Amino acid sequence: MSFGIKVKCRFLAGCNEHGADMTLDELSTREWQALDSAHHMAPFCDYGELRQHGARIITHAEGHYIHDSEGNRILDGMAGLWCVNVGYGRTELVEAASRQMTTLPYYNNFFKTSNRPVTALSAKLAELTPDGLNNVFYANSGSEANDTIIRMVRHFWALEGHPEKRVIIGRDYGYHGSTIMSASAGGMSGMHEQAAHEADFEHIRPPYGFLYQGNQDEAQFAANAASWLADRIAEVGADRVAAFIAEPVQGAGGVIIPPRGYFEHVQEICRRHDILFIADEVITGFGRTGQWFASQTMDLQPDMMTMAKGLTSGYVPMSAVMVGDRVATRLIADGGEFYHGFTYSGHPVAAAVALANLEIIEGEGLVERVRQDTGPYLAEALAPLAEHRLVGEVRTYGMLAAIELVKSKDGPELFADTGTVGAICRDHAIAGGLMMRAVRDAMILSPPLTFTRDDIDETVRIARRALDLTADQLGL
């Protein structure tokens, strides 16, 4: 790619203290890293460490591979950040964006206006999602979608005559975004420490069988884990609890897969206490679990749902809130003006790309492929890694997977310095040509839905080699 723009930079070799205009096309990797370190503050990173070592400069991608400025070709086992469901280089999405940019590159939805792509997308999402979710509010990220849903929920209960119902219950290790509101709903302690945890948010343990199941069978653990929600509702008071928010599979928390029956108990508890159930499908949506949404895979009926990532396969930013009929009916009839929205809500280019993306997923049968072929094959291919001396558990759900690393299988015994070993293993995987993510000491996979069996075999081969190198480095 050619960069015609010139920049004035004082941080590259050959620049004087006053800076010099430079073109970007001929920069070396080290110069790109220096320029990046000088000006770019990336998300979720240690700035000091990043500036010491330099960022990996990704230059281009095609199919299931990303390429960096050093010429390395890396199989993307994370689909970017859980989002590139249809793979890279899809000209259909590029062409959809180009056509829409030519016709209507932008107009807002504030002034009693709409546009054709967003209207068509709204109808399509109502068709694809579980019954009773027929209205859509658009934002730009999962964070914004979950922030929006919290506002809607509290507004709804005020209209119902229960303004005291404001408490949102989430789960430890839950991730619902990084705005103040969505981070408060999530259960990431580091995020709470850096930004004051907002009032009216509570958290319970997740159904993390690897840590909490012990000797219970699956049915016992499902009932016990759901009882943690009932107990917290009793502590807070059902008359104060507005909603329970949960990812069907907790992705950024480490691909925590609930036992069968867990959500059946959870939904019964919510109905009994008249508490709204919110499904955060930002990661699990658009085919990743073998149905369009994990709510369908798990037979859930959420009152509201958030989505992003796979909505456009990450090609452009877009998210959405699916509003259930009960909430939508009240907001429409009695809510008056809803004082919330974004400049880019329902952006016509994003909507056009989303429609083209959904057409690819449907036309290529990717949902069915995950359910009938690649999802089961991923589970089968990864299962032998559970015997590795460094692995305590392998868990998969559709095209989501986690390899839990342990110091010893007895117990199992976890590593004392949580996250260090995961980072070592991740680095070995990347050096070997596979992009994996480390969450604490779990190695995470969330590949494009277009992955083939050959891609899965390559993934397992590199992952096994990374495990071997990590164990050898640790002397295990």
PLM segments and residue spans:
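Conserved N-terminal phosphate-binding loop of PLP-dependent enzymes in the Aspartate aminotransferase
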Residues: T23-L476
